[in-house]
């Protein structure tokens, strides 16, 4: 498997004449910082345009990208200095990934009913992040590296299973626009979060493995944090549009 990964990485080692994986990864740190900052401004500016019961969701979206923007600013500087920003990245994840999971019960309006579900999701998430960190700082390819990586993968799969098997009734009971958004958001957890373990395995690819791993992480963070928030936003706005149309259609009947 290591040989296959090394062969795959070799084809990417030099994207063009002087643009190496290392320099491309550095640029992506700053691009991610800009994307997170722009998304934060957008989410907070648009907060007042969504129905009041969904404004907390927009606040959470803005917090996720705002926290990530700060961390990416710091991580870019650390990477520029020749080190991998592992600690900063995991601090970011331990804060932002639970916030991402909070958005499911918020959008579905589960209230107190969602506390047990949320506690389960957050507990699994923290196990995933903690074990992934231990794997990350272990010797690459060693027994501890693989063992903790596999535990983190199991925790991630349990998060996916929880979202797909314990929220079915709540999704069916939600308005169509919200249920559609939640289904897409589940897809982000299923597919988007799968980029992280793939990126983790890039460390096996040789001299550029660490930079390639960071590149995967950067791309995944932008897709998941910005995209996740935008899906929630457009779902809420679609529902608001339908509710507005229904109110307008009912007004002539009321006046008659």
PLM segments and residue spans:
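Polytopic alpha-helical membrane-helix bundles and their juxtamembrane interface segments
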Residues: 2-89, 98-256
